[in-house]
């Protein structure tokens, strides 16, 4: 749940109406640390499954494995967008949405693993009551974040124009490919 800090900076920037480079500058190291630890966790889990357990593969596309991959992909897109938003001042709305969804996907992964909703060799501590509590927390936080974006997002200025063939255009294409 390391994406909580970029999410919190995003919400604070929306609340204050200060959607400048400051919140992205403060968010980027935290997003990088969270994404880095998630990368290490996924790599170590894959190594462990292959060598120690002898499952014969690095990745089995198990629902719980995918629950860790989704915030990793959203975090990767967030890191790229934070850099461009900080340096060029573009993609503010996109970056805010990525911060919300990266955190939401990490909470969704917690819900899937802990609730017993899915059947997996990786799911543990399946407790419907705990799952309901996590789902309510997920709904409040993500719903509140999206509501804040809807109420305060109008403060976003019109982004500067950029060329069709530019770094910004390729970043948008890159982020769309990552998220698909």
Where is each model-derived feature located?
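Polytopic transmembrane helical bundles with strong interfacial aromatic enrichment
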Residues: 1-180
């Amino acid at each position: 749940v390391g994406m909580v800090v970029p999410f919190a900076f995003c919400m604070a920037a929306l609340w204050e109406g200060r959607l400048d480079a400051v919140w992205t500058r403060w968010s980027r190291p935290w997003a990088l640390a969270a994404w880095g630890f998630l990368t290490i966790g996924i790599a170590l889990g894959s190594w462990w499954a292959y060598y120690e357990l002898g499952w014969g593969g690095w990745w089995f596309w198990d629902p719980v494995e995918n629950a860790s991959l989704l915030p990793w992909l959203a975090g990767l897109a967030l890191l790229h967008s934070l850099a461009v938003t900080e340096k060029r001042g573009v993609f503010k709305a996109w970056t805010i949405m990525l911060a919300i969804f990266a955190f939401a996907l990490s909470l969704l992964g917690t819900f899937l693993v802990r609730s017993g909703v899915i059947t997996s060799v990786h799911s543990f501590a399946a407790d419907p009551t705990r799952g309901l509590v996590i789902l309510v927390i997920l709904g409040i936080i993500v719903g509140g974040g999206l509501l804040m974006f809807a109420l305060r997002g109008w403060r976003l200025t019109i982004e500067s124009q950029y060329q069709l063939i530019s770094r910004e255009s390729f970043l948008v294409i890159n982020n769309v490919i990552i998220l698909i």
